[in-house]
């Protein structure tokens, strides 16, 4: 297995940015779309619960309909080559003895994980569905981070979008997906302009070494 050297890693980390406008003429190849989908599928999650479903939108008309409910992100979404809709599972779907959890793991893994997960729901969340919902969203955002970094490694660009009306976007998608619960959107494509200089806290302000 080959790894990038330190200089290349740092370069990629600095070049990754939230792209605000994409090349509207750029079209993903089927290979690129499959690779992005696989990056998403392989994302890590607590207890390997994978409490998500990813919807890849490449249809221009459908993108336009979703963009209409994304406030100030409309033009950016319309310019993107694809839009990934990150849907979260509902808390009821993650209950230990429910259909989803009982069919998620191989049997040898399930007998170890399910009791531990059930205990965690009691000890950490006090069986609160609201806390479980927050936990599910946390897992989705872990996947979002992996997707955006993975896309950058492909030489492509992304922008995480939280500014949208989830109910309206859900209505657009409902004809194709059964009652989606949307965590966030990710616009994907190729930048049209170079990124501005990255602005971050200094190491002193961002990191404490103990």
Curated annotation (Swiss-Prot):
Pfam families listed in its UniProt record: Nitroreductase (PF00881)
Reported effect, residue 53 to R: In strain: ATCC 49503
Impact when changing residue 131 to K: In strain: 69A
Disulfide bridge positions per record: none
UniProt function note: Reduction of a variety of nitroaromatic compounds using NADPH as source of reducing equivalents; two electrons are transferred. Capable of reducing metronidazole; inactive RdxA renders the bacterium resistant to this compound. The reduction of metronidazole generates hydroxylamine, a potent mutagen and bactericide.
Family: Belongs to the nitroreductase family.
Protein name: Oxygen-insensitive NADPH nitroreductase
Gene that this sequence comes from: rdxA
């Amino acid at each position: 297995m080959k790894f990038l050297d330190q200089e290349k890693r740092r370069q990629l980390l600095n070049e990754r940015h939230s792209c605000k406008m994409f090349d509207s003429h750029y079209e993903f190849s089927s290979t690129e779309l499959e690779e992005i989908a696989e990056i998403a599928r392989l994302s890590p999650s607590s207890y390997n619960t994978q409490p998500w479903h990813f919807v890849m939108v490449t249809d221009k008309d459908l993108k336009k309909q979703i963009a209409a409910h994304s406030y100030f992100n409309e033009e950016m979404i319309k310019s993107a080559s694809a839009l990934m809709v990150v849907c979260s599972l509902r808390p009821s779907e993650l209950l230990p003895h429910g259909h989803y959890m009982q069919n998620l793991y191989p049997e040898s893994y399930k007998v170890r994980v399910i009791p531990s997960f059930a205990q965690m729901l009691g000890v950490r969340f006090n069986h609160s569905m609201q806390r479980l919902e927050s936990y599910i969203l946390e897992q989705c955002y872990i996947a979002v981070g992996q997707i955006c970094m993975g896309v950058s490694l492909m030489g492509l660009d992304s922008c995480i979008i939280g500014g949208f009306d989830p109910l309206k976007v859900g209505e657009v998608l409902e004809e194709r997906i059964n009652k989606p619960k949307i965590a966030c959107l990710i616009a994907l494509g190729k930048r049209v302009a170079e990124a501005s200089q990255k602005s971050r806290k200094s190491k002193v302000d961002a990191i404490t070494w103990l």
